[in-house]
């Protein structure tokens, strides 16, 4: 069965639902890694820091975060090389998403319970993100800043809320 549209889970309308001790059957996170590029270097080793910020509070599902991570990381790997940047995914999908499955087709009314006991079963996880919070950060050299911006633009296209790309460190180096 395919995933429901992300618009079902985007709004922060329900209380946080994160206690994995009490919930069984939670699907695993699709996010493979949170730190990419040259893992031996720190953020202080790079003159430029560029981040992708979300402009409104929302929930982003783990599949969307992973596809955004893959596209940004692949762009950086191909054009810059693994040793010349560091990329960090700053959010972890703690929020458990539930869905009340509905039977469809012939005889569904006899099989389905409708809205009786409609709490729902876990179908995935999402990260809760507040307004103007950073999701991805790329640390790179001055020459690679345009590639980093392009990678974050590709990541932005994989997520539904409006985003912006901020140069947080090294703005003066990029202008000159």
Swiss-Prot record:
<keyword id="KW-0689">Ribosomal protein</keyword>
<dbReference type="GO" id="GO:1990904">
    <property type="term" value="C:ribonucleoprotein complex"/>
</dbReference>
<dbReference type="GO" id="GO:0005840">
    <property type="term" value="C:ribosome"/>
</dbReference>
<keyword id="KW-0687">Ribonucleoprotein</keyword>
<dbReference type="Pfam" id="PF00252">
    <property type="entry name" value="Ribosomal_L16"/>
</dbReference>
<dbReference type="InterPro" id="IPR047873">
    <property type="entry name" value="Ribosomal_uL16"/>
</dbReference>
<dbReference type="InterPro" id="IPR001197">
    <property type="entry name" value="Ribosomal_uL16_euk_arch"/>
</dbReference>
<dbReference type="GO" id="GO:0006412">
    <property type="term" value="P:translation"/>
</dbReference>
<dbReference type="InterPro" id="IPR022981">
    <property type="entry name" value="Ribosomal_uL16_arc"/>
</dbReference>
<dbReference type="InterPro" id="IPR018255">
    <property type="entry name" value="Ribosomal_uL16_CS_euk_arc"/>
</dbReference>
<dbReference type="InterPro" id="IPR036920">
    <property type="entry name" value="Ribosomal_uL16_sf"/>
</dbReference>
<comment type="similarity">
    <text>Belongs to the universal ribosomal protein uL16 family.</text>
</comment>
<dbReference type="GO" id="GO:0003735">
    <property type="term" value="F:structural constituent of ribosome"/>
</dbReference>
<protein>
    <recommendedName>
        <fullName>Large ribosomal subunit protein uL16</fullName>
    </recommendedName>
</protein>
<dbReference type="InterPro" id="IPR016180">
    <property type="entry name" value="Ribosomal_uL16_dom"/>
</dbReference>
């Amino acid at each position: 069965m395919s995933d429901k549209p992300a618009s079902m889970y985007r709004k922060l309308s329900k209380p946080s639902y994160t206690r994995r001790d009490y919930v069984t059957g939670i699907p695993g996170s699709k996010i493979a890694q949170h730190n990419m590029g040259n893992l031996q270097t720190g953020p202080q080793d790079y003159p430029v820091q560029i981040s992708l910020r979300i402009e409104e509070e929302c929930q982003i599902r783990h599949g969307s975060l992973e596809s955004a991570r893959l596209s940004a990381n692949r762009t950086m790997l191909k054009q810059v090389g693994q040793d010349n940047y560091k990329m960090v995914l700053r959010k972890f999908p703690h929020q458990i998403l539930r869905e009340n499955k509905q039977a469809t087709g012939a005889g569904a009314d006899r099989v389905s319970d409708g809205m009786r006991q409609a709490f729902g079963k876990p179908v995935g996880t999402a990260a809760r993100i507040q307004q103007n919070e950073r999701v991805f950060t790329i640390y790179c050299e001055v020459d690679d800043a345009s590639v980093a911006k392009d990678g974050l633009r590709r990541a932005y296209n994989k997520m539904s809320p409006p985003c912006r790309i901020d140069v947080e460190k090294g703005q003066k180096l990029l202008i000159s």
